[in-house]
């Protein structure tokens, strides 16, 4: 809903204002100019606003290598030596800045500390000789679609709901005795309700650590916490990995460790996320799952590099890819990690239904949870009951038992309307648009079968109900059998700067039923359905635990290669193969990975960018093929790329003795004069004995890719009461930048400011809360939209949460 309405209003705005250079109540925070001395200073990530005296927390990376980095480089490093160097750097930093305080310290996968200080003191911190880089302490959130969460009572949980683990092959692995036994999986999340009956077996005496409250009790945020909303996300993730009760996770005998890094409301910051990763490595975790992220598409962000070094320490790091799809370039940190396994979300196979009833030609099925519910509604005369906009109060005093609710779009999410209808006893719902035309959205997993109508048909239906025509019969037929589909919300790559394909792999992430705390003292433990890449990632973390038990000698690189090499290629509803940056290598299959005796790495590869002005340009990549079998094998290789002006060649045959490795070089030549600017995909196919053993996705980009012109925007309180600071991220700068204000109903309120020729990176603007040349915004909640245009392309992004004007 947000995207459609905002897009319409934005077009109107651009046509009307033509992006002139006038500004209203927004003033750019002055940028500090660089001098030759700056070249000797530490690098700043995120273009932090260093003009305000307001205190902020930053992550400080030191030149002294972390334990993991030194080990990888073959250098001698010890905790005592590193601690001495860190203490020396801390003392220098505290002496250099005013009112600075060190918070957390890091040594295992990141060398440095977090520090709170006035922002205008950061330049002095950068000048400290031992400091390598400074990062802002950005916010991380759970990667689930909160508006689609559904709580399920224990007696309603059935084996039919527990489909996703068997679908990726967990049951077959269990039959062979591979259940994740002996493997430690770290859940770095909102905490875990480890007393849940389905999770008790997975925890030992040591549960993990709580970095929010700084104690050894990493439970979820409870109801009534004055700091914010109760959480259940980490418990759901833990159940998907390893529940062992009514619900069975992918690796039911794995040992779990919980690290609470996200607090009330499912929100946390960089300093705690890095601390959680550090502690998991130090505690001996074999696998770690991070179902969290932000909108920063940057491979060198502190959390992303922390996962890179965790992988180098032999811990398989699995992370969600984000929920900002379906557009490209939407993957965020830590999904941008070079080494970790980033996971996209899919929806399990289902039947798509067509519906007819009455004379309502716009009728379409929006979504459903169980196919049996759809069949129960088919060819059955039912009574329709009008229920306003579907809020809980609209059902008060109405008998919906065995009936179908008719509601109007607006105010609350479709899933909430369906949940309210179900609670009132309804067996179905009809929702009609609140704008002219049809509803575009389809929402899988609606708690009751839901049929959508256009505004015109909806008003016609309501008129009929008022006239006493309340009975109808729905005729539902299967229109298409859909295979496993990539979820629209699943974020896409590539990663900026590295141009890497992301996600690496995909797994089920829609309508996943798992364990949750109910926060109800009488019935504290329950089950819930959630969706998001947060739900996909623990499927892979569990799969890794199972594979690691089956293949205890495999390295993190071998496990990653096995999962990617043996994945199933996914096709969309039209039978077209999904792009690499939508599905990665495909959908994971546990048994395929366990049975693999040939491994190809890397599991995907990007050749990077080819500049238009360079004409003919050639790049090579060497792939490693590992023969894990006890016999000599002969491998053949095929190379392909879409797009004219691109040719491929390389090693066509490699013979590898038993338990040995071989090399194959893949070459791509691009005539950029014949190839249009854009992103192009290829594949390296490796066969042995006529059987495909690996399909390796490849990628290249000609000239300037169609990256988003703006990726994030937020509003916070300004240094003066009643003012605000706007923060936005421009990946390559912007020729035109506008800030537009929308009220809580997403109706356009006015323009906050318009700019031209902005630099790349983080930009900060002081705003006095006025619109359209000085009009003060009335008290209430608002959203801010950032619109940026550069080199003929434009993008827009809306604040994730509303801000309050008092």
From Swiss-Prot:
Q: Which residues form the PA domain?
A: 383-461
**Keywords, ordered alphabetically:** Cell wall, Hydrolase, Protease, Secreted, Serine protease, Signal, Zymogen
Question: What GO molecular-function term can you cite, just one?
Answer: serine-type endopeptidase activity
User: Could you say which enzyme class this protein belongs to?
Assistant: hydrolase
Give a yes or no for keyword Protease in this entry.
yes
Which residues constitute the catalytic centre? 189, 233, 534
Q: Which GO terms describe its cellular component?
A: extracellular region
Report the superkingdom from the record: Bacteria
Instruction: Report the PTM annotation.
Output: Probably undergoes C-terminal processing or proteolysis. Auto-processed to form active enzymes of several different molecular weights.
Protein name, entry field: Minor extracellular protease Vpr
């Amino acid at each position: 809903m947000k995207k459609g309405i905002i897009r319409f209003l934005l077009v109107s705005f651009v046509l009307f204002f033509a992006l002139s250079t006038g500004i209203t109540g927004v003033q750019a925070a002055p940028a500090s100019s660089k001098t030759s001395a700056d070249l000797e200073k530490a690098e700043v990530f995120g273009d932090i606003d260093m003009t305000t005296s307001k205190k902020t927390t930053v992550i400080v990376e030191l030149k002294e290598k972390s334990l993991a980095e030194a080990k990888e480089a073959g250098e001698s490093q010890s905790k005592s030596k590193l601690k001495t160097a860190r203490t020396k750097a801390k003392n220098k930093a505290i002496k250099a800045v005013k009112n600075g305080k060190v918070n957390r310290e890091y040594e295992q996968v990141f060398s440095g500390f977090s520090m709170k200080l006035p922002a205008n003191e950061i330049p002095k911190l950068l000048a400290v000789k031992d400091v390598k880089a400074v990062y802002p302490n950005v916010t991380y959130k759970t990667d689930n679609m909160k508006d689609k969460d559904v709580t399920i009572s224990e007696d309603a949980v059935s084996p039919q709901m527990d489909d996703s683990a068997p679908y990726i092959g967990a049951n077959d692995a269990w039959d062979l005795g591979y259940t994740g036994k002996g493997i430690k999986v770290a859940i770095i999340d909102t905490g875990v309700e480890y007393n849940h009956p389905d999770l008790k077996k997975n925890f030992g005496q040591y549960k993990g650590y709580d970095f929010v409250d700084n104690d050894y009790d990493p439970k979820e945020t409870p109801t009534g916490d004055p700091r914010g909303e109760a959480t259940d996300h980490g418990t759901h993730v833990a159940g998907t990995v390893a529940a062992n009760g009514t619900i069975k996770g992918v690796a039911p005998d794995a040992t779990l460790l919980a690290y609470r890094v996200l607090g009330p409301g499912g929100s946390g910051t960089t300093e705690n996320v890095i601390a959680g990763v550090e502690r998991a490595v130090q505690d001996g975790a074999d696998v770690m799952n991070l179902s969290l992220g932000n909108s920063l598409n940057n491979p060198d962000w502190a959390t992303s590099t922390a996962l890179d070094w965790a992988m180098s320490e032999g811990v398989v790091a699995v992370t969600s890819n984000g929920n900002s799809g379906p557009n490209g370039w939407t993957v965020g940190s830590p999904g941008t990690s070079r080494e970790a396994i980033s996971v996209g979300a899919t929806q399990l196979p289902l039947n798509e239904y067509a519906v007819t009833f009455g004379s309502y030609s716009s009728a379409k099925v929006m979504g459903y949870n169980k196919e049996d519910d759809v069949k129960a509604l088919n060819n059955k005369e039912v009574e329709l009951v009008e229920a306003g906009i579907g809020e809980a109060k609209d059902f008060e005093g109405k008998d919906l038992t065995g009936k179908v609710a008719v509601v109007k779009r607006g105010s609350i999410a479709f899933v909430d309307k369906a949940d309210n209808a179900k609670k009132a006893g309804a067996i179905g719902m009809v929702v009609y648009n609140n704008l002219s035309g049809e509803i575009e959205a389809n929402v899988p997993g609606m708690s009751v079968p839901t049929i959508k109508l256009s505004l015109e048909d909806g008003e016609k239906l309501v008129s009929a109900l008022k006239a006493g025509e309340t009975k109808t019969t729905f005729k539902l037929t299967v229109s298409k059998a859909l295979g496993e589909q990539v979820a629209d919300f699943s974020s896409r790559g590539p990663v900026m700067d590295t141009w890497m394909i992301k996600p690496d792999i995909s797994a089920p992430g829609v309508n996943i039923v798992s364990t949750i705390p109910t926060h109800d003292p009488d019935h504290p433990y329950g089950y819930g359905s959630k969706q998001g890449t947060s739900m996909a990632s623990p499927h892979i973390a569990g799969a890794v635990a199972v594979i690691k038990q089956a293949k205890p000698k495999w390295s993190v690189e071998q496990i990653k290669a096995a999962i990617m090499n043996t994945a199933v290629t996914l096709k969309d509803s039209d039978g077209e193969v999904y792009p690499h940056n939508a599905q990665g290598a495909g959908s994971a299959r546990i048994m395929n990975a366990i049975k693999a005796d040939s491994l190809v790495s890397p599991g995907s590869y990007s050749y990077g960018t080819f500049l238009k002005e360079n004409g003919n340009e050639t790049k090579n990549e060497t792939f490693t093929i590992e023969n894990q079998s006890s016999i000599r094998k002969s491998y053949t290789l095929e190379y392909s790329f879409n797009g004219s002006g691109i040719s491929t060649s390389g090693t066509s045959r490699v013979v590898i003795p038993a338990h040995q490795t071989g090399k194959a070089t893949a070459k791509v030549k691009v005539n950029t004069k014949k190839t249009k600017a854009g992103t192009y995909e290829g594949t390296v196919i490796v066969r042995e004995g006529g059987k495909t053993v690996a399909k390796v996705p490849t990628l290249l980009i000609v000239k300037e890719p169609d990256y988003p012109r703006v990726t994030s925007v937020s509003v916070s309180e300004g240094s003066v009461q009643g003012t605000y600071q706007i923060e936005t991220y421009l990946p390559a700068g912007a020729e035109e930048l506008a800030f537009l204000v929308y009220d809580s109903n997403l109706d356009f309120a006015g323009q906050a400011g318009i700019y031209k020729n902005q630099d790349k990176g983080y930009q900060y603007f002081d705003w006095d809360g006025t619109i359209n040349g000085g009009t003060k915004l009335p008290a209430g909640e608002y959203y801010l939209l950032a619109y940026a245009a550069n080199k003929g392309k434009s993008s827009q992004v809306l604040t994730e949460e509303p801000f309050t004007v008092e």
